[in-house]
Each structure stands twice: as structure tokens, then as C-alpha cells.
């Protein structure tokens, strides 16, 4: 279904569900989907996207999406994500991770999966901080714009 339809259904269902119970959205999805769900009252998510995309060389970062198979990372010896949420982010470089993917080393998939899972945990934690601070509605659009960027 189109994402706009999914968001519409989340809003519809959340009007019906008891307000004092947690809301769970299964199988969703991208970091942007998660933020949109949170904005609409969803409390819990699960999905395979962080690990599936990681296994295919796609990394979610605070500044956007990285395809580690792209040639542009071949000589980029900077950390995977300088201020990332996981130990793998500063332990390995983009060039090394790209090399591992092209060499079809299983370690590439593990590093990317650890990175993406840590990123999702960071994102949910940041959303919570901004909800508590009362500025989620101004933080979210800025974050969505950053997360949409292809690096």
C-alpha cells in the first residue's frame, strides 16, 4: 500500500484503540516511517529493514542513506559515521566496509547490520527525548529531511 494510505490507516486505528494501551505497528519500516508512526501515536515497531538493508550494503545515518557498494566510498577512509551510535562506526572506515562488500565477506553484512540496529535505537531515543522536551513537532521535519538525503 502507498505510505500515505498506511499513515491514514494508522490515524484511523489509533482513534479506535484505547488511549491507555501501547500501539504496535508490525513490519514498518524506514526511519522516516518510524518517525511518522511516532507522530501518529505508535509506541512500538518491529521490522527487518535495518538488517536486510544492512546485508545489502545500505546504511542509515544521521545525515542520510549510504549505499556502501558505490564507488565513491572506495577511497574514503573516514569512519562509517564519525558520531555514530555503535562501536563499528568509528572502528571501521567506509573504504574498508565497501571493500568487504565487494569481496563478499560476511563481516560486511555484520558490520552494516550492527550499525543500522544501533542507528534505529539512537533514532527512537532521540524521538523520545524530543517528545519529552515538547519539541518533537519541530525536530521531526528537520530529521525527515536529513534522513531522506542520499549520500
Provide a role label for each language-model segment.
Residues 1-80:
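Glycine-rich phosphate/ribose-binding loops and adjacent secondary-structure elements
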